[in-house]
Amino acid sequence: MTRLMKSLVILFGLFAMQVHAQQSAFQQDGYISGFGPFVRIPGDTMMPKEAEFKVAFDTGVAASPGTVNKTMVAAARFLNMHVDAGISPDKIDLVVVIHGSAGADVGTAAYYEDQHLQANASAPLVSALIEKGVKFIVCGQSAAFYGMSSGDFMPGVETALSAMTAHALL
């Protein structure tokens, strides 16, 4: 093996170890257990303990079948990292506004399986978030476009006239 090849192998190995070390820094269990990995940031992070949050996440594209909706994972991450940083969960008002094809990700098991012939990978996360007080609001216009009615959504999911209306009222 040439000297260049040996050097490249060593550099690749060091890079791989660095990536693994960075990934292992992510906390896997937080306020929303099993979802929303985050990293603890040491030191002063400008996080006043009396802070109150009102945050809306917006998702308009469904997750690929078999995967979890990334915007919903981001909502879980937001909760996990802020609760871990000392913010009381009752000071975090979180809403996920859903439009477009993403409505399927909050569909009932029967609806989702009928559409995709498999279980909804986002359902456990949606249930966990609703259980912790996160609101899910579906755009009524998108629901109508995709042929969904209120009975097609998981328990706890609300419907608004439109996604724009939901955002305007938040």
Locate the predicted segments by residue.
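Sec-dependent signal peptide recognition
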Residues: 3-10
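Sec/Tat signal peptide C-region and signal peptidase I cleavage site
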Residues: 17-21
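A cross-taxonomic marker for long C-terminal extensions/tails that follow the last structured domain
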Residues: 22-34, 112-113, 118-170
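Acidic/histidine-rich, surface-exposed loop or edge segments in extracytoplasmic proteins
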Residues: 48-64, 106-110
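Structural recognition of the beta-strand scaffold that forms the well-ordered cores
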Residues: 54-58, 94-98, 135-138
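Second-shell loop/turn segments in exported
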Residues: 57-68, 94, 113-115, 156
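Histidine-anchored nucleotide/phosphate-binding helix
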Residues: 68-87
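Acidic helix-start/capping segments at beta-turn-to-alpha-helix junctions
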Residues: 88-106
